[in-house]
């Protein structure tokens, strides 16, 4: 994998949490990015979920719109093509996507802020598989926040109470074929409004990083690596 930032193994966190946390922190301070290998995310589950969404995004538009609720502001379920406009942009991105979030008990008070996930009954195991993958990413994010806390000289569990039942989302993005005459970008230069984001590689290269040190740099060849960045 060619990247300007380091690729570090999550196995090293168990061996020496201080050294792992220091290297993670150095990369975040310099680049805002770090690659994580041996991350524990089930790669077979990732492929299953990718296949599930291939089936979904190939559905006719009128079928996909059954799973779009404009009142949710894109918080859960389907968001159609050319709806989301990035921060500081004046044209919507040429993409469609699906959001999966945290599942809560029916009596949980946090339900007033977190809507239910949306199921697609026609796709077998849709909700089970997507929820399972969300939880794996959620656990990885929590562990990396422990490392960030250690790097900052805090107790490893410092962020636990802040992220407990946090309103995180797993976003699956599809960039449909476009005409050259269409205005807008797939996903132009932007900053995400997040604490920590985890990105898996798609089937085509696309991620580029803008840094003060090296200008625009493309990250390529990262099938087995999860890119972690801070927003």
Specify the residue positions occupied by each region the protein language model found.
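Peripheral, non-catalytic segments flanking oxidoreductase cores
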Residues: 1-231
């Amino acid at each position: 994998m060619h990247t300007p930032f380091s690729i570090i193994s999550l196995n090293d966190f168990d061996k020496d949490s201080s050294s792992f946390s220091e290297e993670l922190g150095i990369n975040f301070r310099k680049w805002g990015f770090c690659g994580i290998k041996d991350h524990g995310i089930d790669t077979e589950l990732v492929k299953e979920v990718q296949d599930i969404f291939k089936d979904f995004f190939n559905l006719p538009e009128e079928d996909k719109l059954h799973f779009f609720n404009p009142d949710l502001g894109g918080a859960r379920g389907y968001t159609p093509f050319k709806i989301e406009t990035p921060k500081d942009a004046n044209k919507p991105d040429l993409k469609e996507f699906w959001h999966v979030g945290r599942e809560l008990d029916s009596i949980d008070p946090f339900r007033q802020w977190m809507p239910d996930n949306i199921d697609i009954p026609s796709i077998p195991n849709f909700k089970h598989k997507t929820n399972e993958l969300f939880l794996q990413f959620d656990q990885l994010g929590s562990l990396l926040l422990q490392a960030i806390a250690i790097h900052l000289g805090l107790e490893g569990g410092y962020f636990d109470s802040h992220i407990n039942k946090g309103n995180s989302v797993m976003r699956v993005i599809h960039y449909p074929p476009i005409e050259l005459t269409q205005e807008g970008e797939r996903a132009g230069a932007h900053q995400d409004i997040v604490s920590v984001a985890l990105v898996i590689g798609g089937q085509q290269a696309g991620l580029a990083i803008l840094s003060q040190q090296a200008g625009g740099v493309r990250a390529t060849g990262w099938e087995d690596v999860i890119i972690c960045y801070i927003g």
